[in-house]
Every structure is written in C-alpha cells, then in structure tokens.
C-alpha cells in the first residue's frame, strides 16, 4: 500500500497535480460496479501482484491507480486504507449490510481484523475477537471488543455459540482459511455470513455437505 505526494505528472493527466497527497488503490482497474471478468479470467489484477508494488521511494503509476488521501489522516494512517481498511468495510458494510445489534466475530488481530473490529463497533455491533494471545485479546478489548476467545485454549466455535446463547454469529471475518473454515461454519448463525478474506492456513478445504 502506498501513501505519498505526487512529484510530477505525465501528458493527459487531469485528476492530480504535483504536490497532491495520494494513496494507492488495491485493484487499479476496478473503478466501480462488478469487476468485468469470466470464469477463466478472474478480475484479480492487484497492486503488488499483477502490477508493480509500492516498496520504493518513487513509483510510476496510472492516475486511475491512485485516490486522494484523506485530509484528516497522516501518511502512515492513510496507507492502511486501500487494502486492510476497504477489505473490512466491503465485507461488513457493502456486502454484509451490517446493522446495529448484530454480532461480529473477527479472527486474529491483523490489519483487516482490527479495521473490522472498529467498523463493527462504530455500527453498534457486538464484537468477539479470537486470537492465540491473551495479550492481544486484552488490547482488542481496549479497542472495543466485547469478548475475546483464546483459540489455543479450547474450541473457539463452541465458545462463540455459548456467548450467543447458541444463536451463532451474524458476521464472521474469516482470515485463517484451511480447516479453520469448518469451525466458522459451525459458529455462523442461520442466515449469517462468512467473509473469507485470508487463507493463512492454506487454500484447500474439505467440508461436510450436511452443514
């Protein structure tokens, strides 16, 4: 992710002038609406993947690959928005239609997870965080988490069900992937939503067709 200042512009550039504070976009070719693609060619041409990354003092990018940086944020804060911030927002608000009073379970304490925690709290949701660290769970509670579950000390899905009186979780931010998705399926409420964002434990899964 990038946050910086426009140094110079090329011919035909109209959206930015030298001196403008900008941040990068994660999908430079995806401006609005549904991404254009087909079953053989998925629309995942990202910065730092298909396009060059941003770990440099100077980079050359198309103007559509940039957005204006929020005036209320410094560069360090603004740089977290294009990937982590918008991923959490899109999952919970754009797609999830998050409402006050719903329950949100956030897995881990990484960038997407912490944004999801704060976005959910701002919308009036009850937030549960899972982590393998009691220290990180304590910090998550300071940021607004209602409950913390140490996933290394028991069955986190069962604990989540107990905390919701067996109703289950309305929104689960799934950042682990692999076999962990089985536990998310156990913990999610009827008509609930699982947003699969990370696959730290692997991309391969096997699930019961009866769940």
Q: What function would you assign to each model-found segment?
A:
Residues 103-109, 121-183:
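Adenosine-nucleotide cofactor-binding segment
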Residues 28-107, 142:
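NAD(P)H dinucleotide-binding glycine-rich loop of Rossmann-like/cofactor-binding domains
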Residues 21, 103, 126, 192-194:
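Short glycine-centered segments of the SAM/dcSAM-binding site in methyltransferase folds
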Residues 87, 112, 179:
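Hydrophobic/small residue at the entry helix of a nucleotide-binding pocket
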Residues 123, 131, 176-211:
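Glycine-rich phosphate-binding loop and adjacent beta-alpha segment
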Residues 10, 27, 153, 176-177, ...:
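Short glycine-/small-residue-rich Rossmann-like dinucleotide-binding loops
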Residues 1-31, 50, 70-73:
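Glycine-rich beta-strand-centered segment in the early N-terminal region that forms part
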């Amino acid at each position: 992710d990038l946050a910086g200042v426009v140094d110079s512009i090329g011919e035909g550039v109209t959206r930015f002038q030298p001196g403008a504070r900008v941040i990068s976009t994660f999908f430079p070719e995806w401006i609005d609406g549904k991404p254009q693609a087909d079953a053989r060619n998925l629309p995942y041409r990202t910065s730092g993947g298909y396009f060059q990354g941003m770990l440099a003092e100077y980079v050359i990018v198309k103007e559509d690959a940039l957005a204006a940086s929020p005036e209320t944020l410094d560069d360090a804060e603004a740089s977290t928005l294009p990937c982590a911030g918008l991923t959490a927002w899109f999952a919970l608000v754009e797609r999830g239609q998050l409402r006050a009073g719903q329950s949100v379970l956030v897995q881990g304490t990484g960038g997407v997870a912490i944004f999801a925690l704060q976005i959910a709290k701002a919308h009036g949701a009850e937030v549960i965080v899972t982590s393998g660290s009691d220290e990180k769970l304590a910090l998550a509670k300071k940021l607004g988490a209602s409950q913390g579950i140490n996933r290394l000390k028991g069955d986190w899905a069962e604990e989540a069900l107990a905390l919701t009186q067996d109703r289950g979780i309305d929104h689960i931010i799934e950042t682990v992937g692999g076999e962990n998705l089985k536990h998310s399926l156990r913990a999610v409420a009827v008509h609930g939503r699982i947003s699969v964002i990370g696959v730290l434990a692997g991309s391969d899964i096997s699930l019961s067709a009866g769940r």
